[in-house]
Swiss-Prot record:
InterPro entries: Aldolase_TIM, Methyltransferase_A, RlmN_N, RNA_MTrfase_RlmN, rRNA_lsu_MTrfase_RlmN/Cfr, rSAM. This is Dual-specificity RNA methyltransferase RlmN. The gene is rlmN. HAMAP family: RNA_methyltr_RlmN. Reaction proceeds by a ping-pong mechanism involving intermediate methylation of a conserved cysteine residue. S-adenosyl-L-methionine binds at G197, E198, S229, S253, L254, H255, N329. GO terms for cellular component: cytoplasm. It comes from Sorangium cellulosum (strain So ce56) (Polyangium cellulosum (strain So ce56)). Residues 134-367 form the Radical SAM core domain.
Amino acid sequence: MRSTPLHPVARLPEEWSASLAARGERSFTAKQVFQWIHRRGVLDPAAMTNLPARLREHLAAEGLGEVLTPERVHRSEDGTRKLLLRLRDGATIETVLLPSVSGPGSQAQLDADAAAALDDDEDDDAAAEAGAAPRVRVTQCISTQVGCAMGCGFCASGVAGLKRHLGAEEIAGQVLLGRAMLEEGEELRNVVYMGMGEPLHNYEATARSLRLLTHPEGINLSTRRVTVSTSGLVPEIARLGADFGGQIALAISLHAADDETRSALMPINRKHPLDELLAALRAYPLPRRRRITIEYTLVAGQNDDPAEARRLAKLLRGLPVKINLIPMNPIEASSLGPPAQERVAAFQEVLTQAGYSCFVRRRRGDDVSAACGQLVLLGAKPKVRRALG
């Protein structure tokens, strides 16, 4: 049971209907309030001009207002923007906007192979044929916790451990704010739960935020364009599949093909070893023609040997997957580092020859520490991780 009432930004239309009906408001006002917040991105009750004054006063009294405040925006040379956001209790998180131009002669690069199915770009092709300017599609990477409890050896987010979970209003609020900060010609196309924190460790808030972001009366993101990445919390993977019918795109932070290596890199593997994780993936109710994304961070001298690639190919045999190779991005809190390019290419070649769709993720925003594994709790004191034995 919840110990505190739902924040207004976290309420779904049916919850607004119940609370406003109890106040004697007309039935249609619930839809209006939800649309003001989640379709228009307006959080100031005074600006909700089609609502009665008494209702605007009530919303203000309930605490409707900004849930996070942008403190700094770091812009990378490649156009990536990392936003440092201040929460109401003073804690900070980070979210990242990754623009990608699509059109003739350009590379549609969506970080993290963003939303599983990118086969519906006929509108872009038609615009190009008509002579329209290429659109700038944006993927937003959002956080679900202040810090992280998973302790992965190649990731900066957990260097100071978990401080607290984010509320659904703070998770969805990142997208509301990110959408408001889009630049001319940009459109938000994909949201990836790959920022600070383990989304499924904060399951209730993550699931509620998914419902908010995909609700037809709000932003109305297609579930195909929303990806949840997990380090492998097996019961919650099953729960996500059951609650959303497998419609939410799933990404698995795997990073090793044997339990010994994976447990050294990712402590969660000691609780949910590979056989449990693979069983959960086989049971995930994946729609036809959809695949699970396997994220594999290549760490020099740890998991980047071609023999490891062959083990990975064998491990994943029979699963509907695509593989995203991520050369480790340097972080201050770790002595681990990325492999040489030749090593990455050799690893990819093994997987490609084994019949897998395998891509190497292009670095985005690493010059402003916005790349994969670099989002970090502000003020965290690093505990240096040594190379694994």
